[in-house]
C-alpha cells in the first residue's frame, strides 16, 4: 500500500472515530475533498492543527523543541528540567535529529546550559553535546560556531566528578578527527587541562584522559619534528577507470570526505604539545613507583580515601601504556627537538618497570608489559626507541 493510501485510510479512520459532530459522515470522502473543504472554510472542525497531532502524533522535531523549552526554563523545577534534558538526549541519539539541532537553532541554548549554576544541568548539557557529535562529522563542525571547547574545558575545574567526566566525554567526541576543534583546543591551552585531568582524584577521569591522549596521537599525521600539515580532503576525487565507460554507465560518484577533514586547518602537533605541557612526563610517572619519583612528578593517590595506587588499576595502566607507546612511534631517529634529560630518565625507568614482573602476582603473564597487554613486537620497538635516546 502506498504512503498516500495509508494516509487516506488513517485520516478516514480518525474522522470516523473522532466523535465530532458531522465528522463521521464525511469519512468516505477522499483526502483531496476534505482538504478542499478545509481550505474553503467549510470544515472549521478540522482546521485545528492539534487534530493532526492527535491522529498522527508529534514529530520528533516538535518533541525536541518542547523538551528544550522546558530545559531552559529556569522557572521550572530541577527534576522537570532534568527529565526534559534526558528526553532530548535520547532524541538526538538519532543522527538526523542531532543534525537538525543546527537548523532549529538549538546549539546556542544547549551550550549556554554548560554554565548553568546547577551541576546536574551542566552534566546533562555536556552529555547532550557528546552524544550529538559522536561519530557525526556534521554536528562536530556545526557546534564549533558556538565555541564549546572553552566551555567544556571550564567544566574540568568542577568539584563534581560527574560534571568533569561528561565534559571529557564531550571533548573526546568533539576533537575526534577534527583539526578545527583541535585548533580551538590548542589555542585555549587545553593541554594544561589534560595534564591536570591525568592526576585527578577520580580514577575514571584519568582513564578517559589517557584514552583521549592516545586517540589524539593516533589521528595526528605529524611526528615530533614535523610541521603541522593540513589534513584537508576538500578536493573530491573520482575513482580512476581503466576502461572506457559505456554510454549507459552512470557517472562515478565523487568521493567526499568527512566535514571535519574538509578544512585547510592543520592538525596541531600532538607529540610536541605533550612534551611542552609535560603531559608525557605525567603519563610515564603514573606507571612508576611513587617512591622512585621526585615530589614534583609523583602523581597523587586515587580512591574515596585517597589511598589507592593508580598503577594497580589495569584499565588505567593499559590506556596510559598505549598512549606512551604511541608517542614513541612519533620520535624520529635523530630528533631536532630532543627530549629533556628528565623525560629521558623517566622513559628508561619505565623500560625497567615494564621488563619486571607483573604487579598482580596472580596474573599468568611473566612481565609487566605482557600484563598490560602490550604485544611483543610493539614492546621491542619501544625498547629500541628508548635505547636510542
From Swiss-Prot:
Pro residues bias locations: 242-253
Keyword Glycosyltransferase: no
Chain's role: Functions as a nucleotide exchange factor (NEF) for Hsp70 chaperones which accelerates the release of ADP. Required for fully efficient Hsp70-mediated folding of proteins.
Recorded family membership: Belongs to the FES1 family.
Biological process (GO), any one: regulation of translation
Name used for this protein in its record: Hsp70 nucleotide exchange factor FES1
Disordered: annotated span: 223-255
Any Pfam family hit: Fes1
S-S pairs: none
Subcellular location: Cytoplasm
Organism: Mycosarcoma maydis
UniProt-recorded Gene Ontology molecular function terms: adenyl-nucleotide exchange factor activity
Ranges occupied by ARM repeats: 95-134, 137-176, 179-218, 268-310
Keywords: Cytoplasm, Repeat, Translation regulation
GO CC terms in record: endoplasmic reticulum
